[in-house]
């Protein structure tokens, strides 16, 4: 298997890679002022994050979540937009791809498993939510995983790890779907 990582180089993907879920909402919220980023944590563990330019792109294009107003905001980029970004040359060089999925919920922000409005919140107006279940991956998230599988099949990345960053359960049927070629998953709560 791909874990433990033998290759010290990783690329991070997913809007949650730039805006980690550190806690819940309401009384489950935590002070994140001194909380490490994924890049900091991985670097301190002896790994090299090869695509920090993509993470900068996520921030510049306003992908990510605004946890303070609603827990149901999945604002993930489309794979086609990632490929067209200036940062596309910073990944696909034999490293392990780590796709970070995040879901937040808690007091005063209960997670609904149904009736999620297609499209969700997105300041850019893009269609970012294709299914009706916040606990499932949306079409953009699944599109990134499919794109990563294409890179893996072409020998451009050496593996795919999904990092589930949620204190709440997430529907994980996608993990065993061969469409996405996932080699390992870690739930970090």
Please place each PLM-identified region on the residue numbering.
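C-terminal non-catalytic regions of proteins with extracellular/luminal or membrane-system context
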Residues: 1-189
């Amino acid at each position: 298997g791909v874990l433990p990582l033998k290759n010290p180089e990783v690329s991070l993907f997913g809007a949650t890679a730039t805006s980690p879920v550190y806690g819940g909402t309401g009384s489950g919220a935590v002070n994140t002022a001194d909380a490490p980023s994924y890049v900091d944590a991985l670097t301190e563990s002896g790994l090299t994050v090869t695509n920090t330019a993509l993470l900068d792109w996520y921030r510049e294009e306003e992908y990510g979540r605004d946890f303070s107003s609603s827990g149901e905001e999945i604002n993930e980029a489309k794979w086609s937009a990632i490929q067209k970004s200036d940062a596309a040359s910073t990944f696909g060089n034999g490293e392990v791809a780590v796709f970070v999925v995040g879901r937040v919920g808690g007091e005063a922000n209960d997670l609904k498993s149904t009736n999620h409005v297609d499209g969700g919140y997105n300041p850019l107006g893009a269609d970012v939510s294709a299914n009706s279940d916040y606990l499932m991956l949306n079409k953009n998230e699944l599109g990134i995983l499919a794109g990563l599988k294409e890179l893996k099949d072409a020998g451009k990345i050496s593996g795919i790890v999904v990092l589930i960053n949620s204190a709440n359960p997430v529907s994980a049927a996608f993990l065993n779907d061969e469409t996405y070629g996932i080699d390992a998953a870690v739930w970090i709560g």
